[in-house]
Amino acid sequence: HPGGLLDQAVAVADFFLNDGRIISTKGRHQRSNQIFNASWGERVTDIPIAVLVNGRSASASEIVAAALRDRGRAIVIGASSFGKGSVQTIIRLPNGGELTLTWAHMIAPAGFNLQSHGIIPAICTSSPDNELADMMAAIRGDLPAAGTILNAALASRSAIRSNPDLARERCPPARAERTEDPEIAKYLLEHKSLYTRALRDGGAAIAER
């Protein structure tokens, strides 16, 4: 999803969250600093969630993915997202023209800036090595091996999540949609132990505050 309106992204994330932070914005001007929290009362409960992203996922879709991931509500699968974390405002000019000004940056619940870094998935399907091929071969054939390979994939993401630049390099923002992503998501959602580990180990990089 290439993006959308901030308030709509907040509304979508709010549907799956009980309370707490969804996103905040931070800029130089006092009015650019805002906090968006979920309203009390989760509307969708006890349902495991997988969010699919790639290099075309930007802005509003990144807000939803970051909120659900950082709050431990969903696992993220795919390629690193675009990294469009800036907020623009329109200034009306005396001659009738308009000036679009970057007003603020979006800060995920974990505290990191979405701009440039984007969302790093817990399970990467754009890695330049053979990780995806091994995963798919295991999922489509030997299911016990799939658990081992997916655990290894989670471990590799967890080991570099404190370095978002390195994580993005290891999981580049591929733009093409992969048919394997929904298949991996389905497998994880059907295997509770793997899903639980993905929630634990597939979180955000260390925050840039």
Could you say what each language-model-derived stretch is?
Residues 1-209:
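C-terminal "post-core" interaction segments
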